[in-house]
Each structure stands twice: as C-alpha cells, then as structure tokens.
Amino acid sequence: DGISLLPYFAVQKELEESDNDRLSGELVPIISRDQFDDEAEKFLTRYCPEALDKPMRVPIETIASDMKLQVIEDVPLSDNLTYFGTIIFDNGNVLDKHRKITIRNAKRGTVYLDPRVSYERSVGTKRTTLAHECFHWHRHQPYHVLMKMIGADDNLGKAIQCQIAANSMDSDKWKAVEWMEWQAKDVAPRILMPAKMTRMKANQLLATYGGVDDASITAYENVIDELAELFDVSRQAAKVRLMDLGYSKAEGAYPFVDGQYVRGYSFEAGALGKNQTFTIPYADLFKAYCFDREFKKLIDSGQFVFTDRHLVLNNEKYIARNQAGNATLSEYALTHMDECCVVFSKGYSYQSKYQGVKYYTQFMRNAAPVENQVEYS
C-alpha cells in the first residue's frame, strides 16, 4: 500500500510546535500527573485562548472542527458501552480484542462517539469524551505514525479505543496505549474546566456562602451544580475537579457510590488528606474484610457499623434508626464525620517511564458511571 507522508508531516509540525519534546522510545509524551493542568492550558492556548481569560463553556465541538476532526455519533462501539469513544489515526477497519471488526472503512481524523453516552450517562460525559479524543489527536500522533512505519499489527497504528474503566493493572506493566489513555483521561476534564478559571468562579460562588472554609455542604452542592451548568460538564466531573484543585470540603458533596447518591456530609478542615475519603463501596469493604486480617478484627469487634456506605462508630450519638428500623447516620454524625468514621485511602499503584518522575497513579475498581470511582484500602 505504501506509506502516506501526510501523517508524518502532521507529526513533524506537532513536534516543532510543542515545547515539551520529552518522548519515550515509542514517541509517547512523557507527562507526569502534576503537569496535566499545564497540558490543558497549552491545548487551550492553541485552540481556545479565550477560555483562559474568563470562566466559560469550552466549545469543544468547535475545537474538534477546527482541528479538522469529523465527529460521528451514530455507531455503537461495543455491545455493553465498554468504549465511549474512538479516534482514527489511519484509514482502515477497527478491530476489537477478539479481532472482530467494530468499524469498517474508518477514515483518518474521525472521532466516533457512542450514541448511548448522552442518554445513558450525560451530555457532560459526551463532552469530556470528545475532549479526550481531541487531546489524543493533539499529542499522540507520533506514536501512531511510528507504529505504521514499523508495520505494527492490529489497531496500534490505526486507532485508540477509549474505555470507560481505567486500567486496573499495575502501572509498571502498562503499554504505550495505556499510558496515552491515562494522559487523555486526566487532561480532558482539565481542558473543559481550566484550573485558573475554575478557581476564580468557585471562589466567587463560595464567597456568597461565607467562603471556602465556612460554606456548608449544601452550599458546596449548589456551587457544584452551578459550575456543572456553566462549564457544561457532569455533576461528578465538577465535584472531582474541585477536589483536584484543593477544595477538600467538596468530598462530602453529592457522594455517589454503588450506583446511588448518599447523603452529603461535612467534617473538620484537614481531617482528610489528599485522596482520602469517608465513603467506600460495599465490594471494596468486603474485599478489605476478606484480605486484611487487622481490618477483619476491627469489623468483627462490633465497634463499627457499616451504614450509608460509611464505617461508623457504633454509638447512639452517631447512629440513628430510620422508619424501617435500619441503621443510618445521625444528623450530628453527618456534620462531624471526622469524629466517628473510618478514613479510607484511595488505591494507588506506582511509577513508569511515561511519567518521567516517580509518581503515583490512580485506578478505578471497575466500569463506573462517574469519573472518580476508585479502589480503596
């Protein structure tokens, strides 16, 4: 077939314009987690600089068009919504892991968004997926050109299929495609909610409720909803972004676990460290009970009750009963979680060459309907 030089020249242009020329041997950008906000800012500087001057809805659909990407939303990408989106780097058929053709005659520069994303998840989730694919196009073309030039098999030179579930494998076992997915997954929400503008708007809104430290959990939920509407992202994306930016009280707003919201809660400032929480899915609690001997002893002692997806001291000050007679958190407990609840650390695995520095990598336990479901310890 011969190799088209168009992708090669596009890659040359990208490398010349990029001020981060740190690439792995496979031409994957070397980006550490603490550089993600900078990556998002560079993307917006190039494609939508006005989004760095005022809090606004980032027109990611227009950006995709300006990047000469064609967006198609009428092709299901998997049987069970395993993939939200796919971006095509070279013409041809796209195969799944069983070598079954999922997209025929795909064209370079095409983004496929599964049509079920909007109505089974949210429009905000669709926008995050599109930002994810745009970042792939912006930063990950060199790898795909290399794969084509060396004659790599399967999809490696053609497409990235973007799964909703983060990779649960240890990061030191990740392949290049998995590192590119990690980069795009974490940069995408930062593109839609750039750090400086999100802080500006969040502080402005929280000031009407007494400020960052004094605002109630209800106030934080109102602010999250206003940010979600302004930036046109999902509620959970807005919450997670606030937490990323250091608004720790947002942890207690709109807790979503095991497919449902539980009641919001508050706690003393400083009670939770980074990547800590009072909320844990039932499956993760059960896993800890089965595999951690000391934790099993703690549960078996009867000192704690698992209710509302929190592990709470078994004391009438903190435990109330609902009309059905089931244990639930008391109103006092909901405003003093640091007094009565076990703190869980979100699970991490370590390192890799694609980050450039030793850094921890966040994982999700399974396919989740929200952007921040993780494994706990």
Label every PLM stretch briefly.
Residues 1-377:
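Active-site hotspot residues in diverse enzymes, especially metal/ion-binding acidic/histidine motifs
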